[in-house]
Design a protein with these regions (language model features):
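Phosphate-binding/switch region of NTP-binding enzymes
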Residues: 130-193
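Pre-Walker A adenine-sensing motif
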Residues: 1-16
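Conserved P-loop
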Residues: 12-84
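Alpha-helix termination/capping residues and helix-transition junctions
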Residues: 61-64, 89, 160
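P-loop NTPase motor core
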Residues: 89-158
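Conserved nucleotide-binding/hydrolysis micro-motifs of P-loop NTPases
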Residues: 50-52, 73-76, 101-102, 141-145, ...
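Short, surface-exposed amphipathic charged segments that create phosphate/polyanion-binding patches used
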Residues: 81-88, 181-184
């Protein structure tokens, strides 16, 4: 992509799976809210940290008719995943995983946790690819000394793939910014929010 500004929507449509890196959860919620507000296709919002659900339930964020809020708890995640895969393999949809950190937390204790989560994300990506659906994965993260994205609190490596679009969200004062990243995590271009 050239060094000009591009829209977030154009960046999200480059690949099926989009990694959304952030350090501030309110910036993430603002970004997700903005991106899904104009979405006409079915939306599956997997809310592991329940922040977005709280905003919807309190009326801060409008509840949309095409929005399916899922809170995987009490062992429901695998059933929820099966249902989402069945639906997105038939109809173009938007899938939001909020967040990868919460994904790790809910499955903590499972054997080979990293591989299991990578498999779930790739399974969703494969199903979404057939219908040109879009997946956004929020990741509370930072770059480590080697220039690789790691989960903010645990230091676990973040799933990486050259076919993922990477967007970094930042906040300065009261303004949110989005930057499209290259596969090596260097800055590509600023995105218009």
């Amino acid at each position: 992509m050239d060094q000009k500004k591009t829209t977030v929507q154009n960046a999200l449509e480059q690949n099926t799976t989009n990694m959304i890196f952030y350090e501030d959860s309110f910036t993430k919620i603002s970004f997700f809210t903005r991106e899904i507000s104009n979405c006409k296709v079915p939306i599956f919002y997997i809310d592991f940290d329940l922040q977005y659900t709280g905003f919807v339930k309190s009326g801060i964020t409008e509840e949309m008719e095409n929005l399916n809020l899922l809170h995987p708890e009490n062992g429901s995640f695998r059933e929820d995943l099966k249902s989402i895969i069945a639906k997105i393999s038939r109809e173009k949809s938007l899938i939001v995983i909020d967040s990868l950190n919460g994904f790790f937390n809910i499955l903590e204790g499972d054997k080979d946790l990293g591989r299991l989560i990578n498999s779930f994300v790739m399974l969703l990506s494969s199903a979404a690819n057939h219908t040109k659906s879009t997946i956004m994965v929020g990741v509370l993260s930072k770059l480590n000394e080697e220039g690789r994205w790691v989960l903010y609190n645990t230091g676990r490596s973040v799933i990486d793939n050259e076919h993922f679009t990477k967007i970094q969200l930042t906040r300065k004062e009261n303004n949110a910014f989005a930057t499209l990243l290259n596969s090596d995590n260097s800055r590509d271009s600023d995105l218009i929010l």
